[in-house]
A protein has these predicted regions:
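Short alpha-helical segment of the dimerization/phosphotransfer core of two-component systems
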Residues: 68-73
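Helix-loop junction within the histidine kinase core
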Residues: 84-95
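Short alpha-helical Gxxx[C/S/T] motif in the catalytic ATP-binding
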Residues: 206, 210
Length: 245
C-alpha cells in the first residue's frame, strides 16, 4: 500500500508539472503572438501610408516609426533564438582578456537612445580597474539586457551600473529607482514564460537569457527590490583577473 501511495504521489506530481509546463507554454505563445503582432501591424500600417504622403517631414516621421518597429521585432526574434540556443547548450564560450569598463561603456552607449526623459544613466567603476578573462560577447549580452530591463521600469531618477573584482570573480550590479518588483513576483521573473508586469513592452526574455548565460559560465544572478523605490540586479561569475598594464 505504501508503495502504491508513493507511486500515486509521483504520478500526481508529474501530472501537475506537465500541466504547469503546458500553461506556461500557452502563456508564452499568447504573449509572443501579441509582442510580434504589435510591431508587425505598425510596420504594415505605416508602410501602406507612405505612398500617399507627399510632405517630406511627415514621410520621414513614418519612416522613423517603421525603423523603430523593425528593430523591436528583430530584438524579439533574436531573444527567442538566443535563449533557445543557450538553454540547449549550443553556444561556445570564447574567454579573452577584456576591459569590463569598456564593455559597460559600449552597452550604455547602445542603450542611450532608450533612456527616458528624467532618467540618468550612471556608471561607477573601481579606482583601479582590472582586466577580466571571460567571453566579452556574453557579458555584454547580460549587461545590455539588465540595463534595458532597468530602463523599461524607470521613469524618474537613475539607472546605475557598477562592478568590483576579486582575484577569482567579478560582481556586476545594475540598480534603478524604478517601480520595483512585488515580493510575490520575485520568484518568477527569471522564468522564460513569465513577466512581472504584463504592461511592460517586451517578450519577457531578457532576464531568462541573463540567468541562462550565468548558469553556463557557473555564475549567479540575484535581485533585491522594493516596490516604488527600485531594484538591484547582481551577477557574480568566476574569472581570472589581472591588473591593467
Amino acid at each position: 500500500i505504501t508503495r502504491l501511495k508513493a507511486t500515486e504521489a509521483m504520478l500526481i506530481d508529474a501530472k501537475e508539472k506537465a500541466e504547469e509546463s503546458d500553461r506556461l507554454k500557452s502563456a508564452f505563445l499568447a504573449n509572443m503572438s501579441h509582442e510580434i503582432r504589435t510591431p508587425l501591424n505598425a510596420i504594415i500600417g505605416f508602410s501602406s501610408l507612405l505612398p500617399h504622403i507627399e510632405d517630406a517631414e511627415e514621410r520621414n516621421h513614418y519612416i522613423s516609426l517603421i525603423n523603430h518597429n523593425n528593430e523591436l521585432l528583430l530584438n524579439i526574434i533574436n531573444d527567442v533564438l538566443d535563449l533557445s540556443k543557450i538553454e540547449a547548450g549550443h553556444i561556445e564560450l570564447s574567454p579573452v582578456w577584456c576591459n569590463l569598463s569598456d564593455l559597460i561603456d559600449e552597452s550604455c552607449t547602445e542603450c542611450q537612445p532608450n533612456v527616458p526623459e528624467g532618467v540618468t544613466l550612471k556608471k561607477r567603476y573601481p579606482a583601479t580597474p582590472n582586466l577580466i578573462k571571460q567571453d566579452p560577447m556574453r557579458i555584454k549580452q547580460v549587461l545590455s539586457n539588465l540595463i534595458s530591463n532597468a530602463l523599461k521600469n524607470t521613469v524618474q531618477g537613475y539607472v546605475e551600473i557598477s562592478y568590483e573584482t576579486t582575484p577569482s570573480e567579478t560582481r556586476i550590479s545594475v540598480s534603478d529607482t524604478g517601480r520595483g518588483i512585488p515580493e510575490d513576483k520575485l520568484g518568477i521573473i527569471f522564468e522564460r514564460f513569465e513577466k512581472a508586469d504584463t504592461f511592460i513592452q517586451g517578450a519577457g526574455l531578457g532576464l531568462p537569457i541573463c540567468r541562462s548565460i550565468m548558469e553556463h559560465i557557473n555564475g549567479t544572478i540575484e535581485v533585491t527590490s522594493t516596490v516604488n523605490k527600485g531594484s538591484t540586479f547582481t551577477v557574480v561569475f568566476p574569472c581570472q583577473v589581472r591588473p591593467m598594464e
